[in-house]
Design a protein with these regions (language model features):
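"…together with the soluble PPM/PP2C metallo-phosphatase catalytic core" -> "…together
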Residues: 1-167
Length: 167
C-alpha cells in the first residue's frame, strides 16, 4: 500500500518537475512518461524497513547495501554512466552485503556462496533495470515477486516477513 501511495506522489512530482522519459526507439511508450518509479519503491521499502525491522548488524548492512545500489541506479538514470562504471558500483554494493556475511547459503562453501550471492545481486539489479523501458513493467514484475515471496512467507510461518511484504 505504501508503495502505491509513494508511486503516486513521486509520479506527480516527476511530472510537475519535468522528470519524464520522452518517447524514443528503445522505449515502448508513445508519450512522455514520468520517471523516478524506483525512488518511490526505494522510499517505501526503506520506510517500512525502518519502522518494522529491528536495527541489527544484518538489517543495517542490508539497508546500507541496498541504499548504495539505489544510488548507483539513480546516478545512472540521471547522468547515464558507462556500463563498466555501473558494474563497479554494483560490485561495491554487493561487496557491502557479503562483507557482512549476508550470502545465499546454497552450497555450504562460503567462497562459492559469496560468488553466487554477488552474481545474483548484480543479475537481479540489471534484470529490473532492463525491464524499466516500459511504464510500470518493472514495478509490476516487482509486485508479482513480492506476492510470491508473501505466499512463501505465509506457507513457512514467517509472519514478520509476510507483514513487511504486505505493506
Amino acid at each position: 500500500m505504501l508503495g502505491i501511495l509513494m508511486t503516486l506522489v513521486v509520479r506527480h512530482y516527476a511530472t510537475v518537475r519535468g522528470f519524464v522519459a520522452k518517447p524514443k526507439s528503445d522505449r515502448w511508450h508513445k508519450r512522455p512518461t514520468a520517471m523516478m518509479g524506483g525512488v518511490a519503491i526505494f522510499l517505501a521499502t526503506i520506510i517500512m524497513y525502518a519502522l518494522f525491522v529491528p536495527p541489527t548488524r544484518d538489517s543495517l548492512a542490508l539497508m546500507g547495501g541496498s541504499t548504495f545500489l539505489f544510488l548507483v541506479g539513480l546516478v545512472d538514470d540521471t547522468i547515464n554512466i558507462k556500463p563498466y562504471q555501473k558494474l563497479i558500483g554494483q560490485l561495491i554494493g554487493a561487496a557491502i552485503l557479503v562483507s557482512f556475511g549476508l550470502t545465499l547459503p546454497i552450497t555450504g562453501y562460503a567462497l562459492v556462496d559469496i560468488w553466487i550471492t554477488t552474481f545474483w545481486i548484480i543479475g537481479i539489479t540489471n534484470a529490473i533495470n532492463l525491464l524499466d523501458n516500459m511504464d510500470g513493467l518493472a514495478a509490476g514484475i516487482s509486485a508479482i515477486a513480492s506476492i510470491a515471496l508473501g505466499i512463501s512467507f505465509a506457507v513457512n510461518g514467517q509472519m514478520t516477513e509476510l507483514a513487511f511484504v504486505a505493506v
